[in-house]
Design a protein with these regions (language model features):
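Bacterial Sec-dependent N-terminal signal peptides
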Residues: 1-5, 18-73, 698, 702
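Patatin-like phospholipase
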Residues: 60-133, 141-446, 450-465, 474-475
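Buried hydrophobic packing residues in well-ordered domains
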Residues: 106, 136, 152, 242, ...
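Flexible glycine-/small-residue-rich
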Residues: 236-238, 347, 413-417, 471-475, ...
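Acidic/histidine-enriched alpha-helical segments
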Residues: 309, 379-397, 514, 635-638, ...
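Outer-membrane beta-barrel and related beta-rich outer-membrane complex signature
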Residues: 314, 549-551, 591-599, 650-654, ...
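Gram-negative/organellar outer-membrane beta-barrel architecture
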Residues: 438-439, 458-626, 630, 719-729, ...
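C-terminal outer-membrane beta-barrel translocator/porin domains of Gram-negative envelope proteins
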Residues: 478-483, 608, 614-756
């Protein structure tokens, strides 16, 4: 009992020899006392004298610098002290003292640390201090909180690392008015200061932020890592100051994220004191010095980074060159530091790289086997330190604490701009004083990020019960770029621009242009009129130029060029991120120009132009809970619209031709003067198994009067060829926009199978009924004017350039196999 009270005191590493003699002396007394039957008063007296002796010896102890989040230490002095001790004591049977556990970085290879922790739990060996870098910081931080090795193993089995480490976030967290442009670019540049700059990393890592904040929620009020179940430190590199920093306080989630910010891959973590942290592996990949500075006397080191790091192999490529260059100093230092460990564990990770998270379970098992292989050495070290080993795993972390509520008295938003502070506070929808849970904070973070004004949000609760929100503002001006090529309209380049607060606070200007033979241009201005961003007013301007195909016997023989200019304004209300209701009006001016081939088919002798104006009053309800814009894993999308249209008469500028030919043109191009329409679209994605998804969809389009051939619903086309939300109805088995109808209803059923990561095999069966009138559509379910049944198969792949799909399809009306190809993000 005496010994176990003493060993929790902090040792002065700079007077280590004196401490060692005193410790051995006191330990012997502790053993004698524990083995004897002594009166309680005598025991108290002896312990008091021992404590006084300790205080006298340690008067000159050097205190550890503990300001901010960075702990400094003299690495050279610690190295010399450790060398003297290890060499001077020889084979001493008694060590005593504190045990440190040091976990290296290594990306996915770092999952081997979980297996090591499981083995240590089984042996009953519990460290007094933990330090880690990169993935070692993540796993070590969770273990320091109180998670057991088995619980962390469970997290590893349940975690979707591909999603956590992806550059896209769950689309359900994006405000509805921004979903249409969300995650549709290959790269982007932002205006920071007065210069355009690329992002500081390929992955913002918001999914990882959310993951860390959720798991560390019980420690949200912890400001010093010494207050954790096991004192903890992690390393990160400050690229501005050129320093290797040991993080010992602040937000545990932020420290873990900072320590694994691989340069170029993850964006660095920028703190309030203007420090810019990157992966600690660039400077100290095996932080043994940090463990010694905390007071560790003996160290168990687990290294997963240096094995075969600099051995040549035929697959050596650019990626490995960049990784080894960035981590060169840290890896070299880790090789040297490994020799200073009392027990060094190096799992056999041959064939595993820093990115093979798909093999997480195997990597973990290799770490477990490596620790078991050194079981005797670990147990011997623990016994020499006076540990009771072999008592089994510790009590598990109570996961119910993840649901704990925390009382707050006030909310502090740490932003320089007063309007932005108010906006962030309102958007978070948090109130104080109140009790908050992690779910409340997750929802607040989603609201802030989904607004588009912030890239991520850090938070913590201080000792005065103040909730601090540190949202990272997004660049005020961003340009993003993408490309697209398909068989419907050819190749195109897509440029998007977004400006925040261009004319007033809490507003946004979006401009998107598709540069192609059939161009499109959209510009919208949105301003929020409610404190919590639920109500907004939006104005749109758009231009489109497209070719409407004219088919005869399944052949595209002619076309009509359609040029349109439109303007609309509406009031929107978003009760939640995935739902919006819009009420507004739209004006459009359309000019249609048939080509020579079209005039030949209908009997006109000269070219002509046909113009028409229209006014549309509409009310739309939209809901979208899909997880991704392309190949989602779950969710549903619903669009319901009711509209009333007023059209001007079709103005003809054709100079010659038979009267019946002009009538044909009018029936193709004209719209009725007044009518109403109802549109409904549904799409769902349901996960049947881990790699199989079922996707039913429905479409319903009704007009109260018969419309022209090119003024109604256009049916046909493969994947990703929709240019107009309501008029285009994709259908497997016929050509792009091959058929048209005044009214249509249809259903499709897709089965999507994940073959490998983002590679899918898709099969589709679809059916549609087409009619000229709304009444005719309802009366002709058994005998429609046109009944289409088709289907096909496609291979789809989510590439860095956007979704790619190659499909083949057939329908009962077409009597031919249609092949379609598409690559790139859609407009």
């Amino acid at each position: 009992m005496a010994y176990f009270m003493i060993r929790r005191l902090n040792f002065n590493r700079y007077n280590y020899c004196s401490w060692r003699r005193c410790l051995n002396f006191l330990y012997l007394w502790g053993v004698i006392i524990e083995g004897a039957v002594v009166h309680e008063k005598i025991m108290r007296t002896i312990l008091l004298l021992m404590a006084v002796a300790f205080c006298c010896v340690g008067q000159n102890a050097v205190a550890m610098v503990d300001t901010l989040r960075v702990c400094q230490y003299d690495s050279v002095q610690l190295t010399q002290d450790t060398t003297d001790i290890l060499c001077g004591e020889g084979d001493s049977s008694w060590y005593g003292g504190q045990l440190g556990l040091v976990l290296s970085g290594g990306g996915a290879r770092g999952l081997a640390h979980i297996g090591v922790l499981r083995a240590l739990d089984e042996m009953g060996v519990r460290p007094d201090y933990i330090t880690g870098t990169s993935m070692g910081a993540v796993i070590g931080g969770l273990y320091a909180m109180g998670y057991t090795g088995e619980q962390i193993s469970q997290l590893n089995r349940e975690a979707d690392w591909n999603e956590l480490l992806s550059r896209t976030i769950d689309m359900r967290k994006v405000a509805f008015d921004q979903k249409s442009s969300f995650s549709r670019s290959v790269f982007s540049i932002g205006l920071r200061g007065k210069r355009f700059r690329f992002k500081l990393g390929y992955i913002e890592g918001q999914n990882l932020w959310d993951f860390f904040f959720r798991l560390t929620w019980p420690a949200v009020k912890v400001q010093r890592f010494d207050s954790l179940a096991i004192p903890f430190r992690c390393c990160a590199g400050d690229v501005l100051r050129g320093e290797c920093c040991v993080l010992d306080s602040g937000s545990l989630a932020v420290a873990m994220r900072a320590s694994m910010s691989v340069p170029g891959v993850f964006t660095p973590v920028v703190t309030r004191d203007r420090r810019v942290y990157v992966d600690g592996g660039v400077c100290d990949n095996l932080p043994i010095d940090a463990a010694l500075a905390m007071g560790a006397d003996r160290v168990i080191g687990v290294n997963v980074s240096t094995q075969n790091a600099y051995e040549y192999n035929p697959t050596f490529g650019l990626r490995r060159i960049l990784n080894n260059s960035a981590m060169y100093f840290g890896i070299r230092k880790a090789q040297e530091d490994l020799q200073r460990c009392d027990v060094a564990i190096e799992p056999n990770l041959e064939g595993m790289t820093s990115s093979t998270f798909s093999s997480g379970r195997e990597i973990e098992q290799r770490g477990y086997l490596a620790a078991l292989a050194q079981r005797e050495e670990i147990m011997r070290l623990a016994q020499r330190m006076g540990r009771k080993v072999g008592v089994g795993a510790p009590c598990g972390f109570d996961t119910r604490r993840l649901l704990d509520s925390v009382a707050i008295d006030s909310i502090v938003v740490e932003l320089e701009s007063l309007p932005l502070r108010r906006f962030a506070l309102n958007a978070s929808q948090l109130k104080a004083p109140s009790k908050i849970t992690q779910a409340n904070m997750q929802r607040a973070s989603d609201n802030l990020i989904g607004s588009g004004y912030f890239t991520h949000c850090i938070y913590y609760v201080d000792e005065q019960r103040r909730l601090h929100l540190l949202p990272q503002p997004a660049p005020r001006f961003v340009m993003s770029f993408a490309a697209n090529v398909n068989d419907a309209w050819g190749a195109s380049a897509i440029v998007r621009m977004r400006m925040l607060n261009p004319f007033s606070n809490v507003s946004r200007l979006d401009v998107a242009a598709m540069v192609t033979a059939q161009p499109k241009l959209d510009a919208s201005y949105t301003t929020y009129v409610s404190p919590r961003m639920k109500a907004f007013v939006r104005f749109d301007l758009d231009y489109t130029s497209e070719k409407l195909p004219y088919y005869v016997n399944n052949q595209n023989v002619a076309s009509v060029w359609k040029h349109g200019v439109g303007a609309q304004g509406f009031i929107g209300y978003m009760p939640m991120l995935s739902l919006t209701m819009d009420l507004g009006a739209r004006y459009s001016f359309v000019s249609q120009v048939p080509n020579k081939e079209y005039n030949t088919w209908v009997g006109l002798k000269s070219l002509g132009k046909y113009r028409q104006q229209s006014l549309r009053l509409f009310f739309d309800v939209r809901c979208n809970t899909l997880t991704r814009p392309y190949f989602p894993e779950r969710g549903q999308s619903v669009v319901a619209s009711v509209a009333y249209l007023f059209n001007s008469p079709l103005q003809s500028y054709s100079s010659a031709g038979k009267e019946e030919a002009k009538q044909k043109v009018q029936s193709d191009l004209d719209k009725p003067h007044q009518f109403y329409s109802i549109n409904f679209r549904y799409r769902g994605t349901f996960s049947l198994w881990s790699a199989v998804y079922l996707e039913p969809s429905l479409v319903l389009g009704l007009n109260s009067r018969t419309t022209g051939r090119f003024s109604s619903y256009l049916i046909g086309g493969g994947c990703f060829t929709v240019r107009d939300e309501f008029s285009d109805v994709p259908f497997y088995g016929i050509g792009y926009r091959q058929l048209s109808a005044s009214d249509v209803w249809g259903a499709a059923f897709d089965a999507r199978i994940r073959l490998w990561k983002e590679l899918f095999f898709v099969t589709r069966v679809n059916y549609a009924q087409l009619n000229d009138t709304m009444a005719g559509l309802f009366r002709s379910f058994t005998n429609p004017k046109v009944g289409l049944l088709g289907g096909g198969a496609a291979v789809a792949w989510m590439t860095p350039l956007g979704p790619m799909a190659v499909s083949a399809s057939l329908a009962n009306q077409a009597q031919k196999v249609w092949f379609n190809f598409s690559l790139g993000y859609t407009f």
